[in-house]
Amino acid sequence: MLTLNTRINSADKVSAQLVLPYESRENSRLRTALSSGEEVAIFIPRGTVLRHNDLLMGDDGRVVQIVAARESTYRITCANPHDLLRCAFHLGNRHTQTQVGEGFLRIARDNVLKEMLEGLGATVIEEDAQFEPEAGAYGSGGHHHHGESSQGHAHGPLAPIPVHQKIHRPSDIPSR
């Protein structure tokens, strides 16, 4: 089995392509198969998200190109930028993985979200497309759920507020 464990920026020769849906590209440990049928194991740093055209080098020196699979998605457009921004806000408020394009948003198909977006005035079209959602504010590509600690994994340029630090709001100060 070929083990892919190093991401590289360029290569003179690509030996194979590995087509993966976004959900699989989020996994730092994955066992799968190339289109040739050869089994591969991916072992990359935790929190790494593989993107379309990323290159991974195997333990034997071979290079495999990652290809984003076509997935069932919704393409969201609006009559004006303000309405599209409102849709992006509501999707983000629901922690929905969202791809931001030039004049459109793309999400995985979800009928409840479709109804919400249409209620906001959006045009929602079913589309099979490569799904490349934003990595998130911290750039790690991973996420954690409310109530889980964010300690123990790296973040990008925006640092989280340390757990021991209190954020003071006007309502926190006792009235005198």
UniProtKB/Swiss-Prot annotation:
Keyword Zinc-finger set for record: no
GO BP field? protein folding; protein-containing complex assembly; urea metabolic process
Q: Where is this region: Disordered?
A: 134-176
**One Pfam family in the UniProt entry:** UreE_N
Q: Which InterPro entries match?
A: UreE, UreE_C_dom, UreE_N, UreE_N_sf
Q: Where is this gene product found?
A: Cytoplasm
Keyword annotations for this protein, in alphabetical order, are: Chaperone, Cytoplasm, Nickel, Nickel insertion
Q: Name one GO cellular component term.
A: cytoplasm
| Primary site of residence | cytoplasm
The UniProt GO MF terms for this protein read: nickel cation binding; unfolded protein binding
Describe the task this protein carries out.
Answer: Involved in urease metallocenter assembly. Binds nickel. Probably functions as a nickel donor during metallocenter assembly.
Q: Name the protein family.
A: Belongs to the UreE family.
Which NCBIfam families would you find in this protein's record?
A: PRK13261.1-1
Stated name of the protein: Urease accessory protein UreE
Gene designation per UniProt: ureE
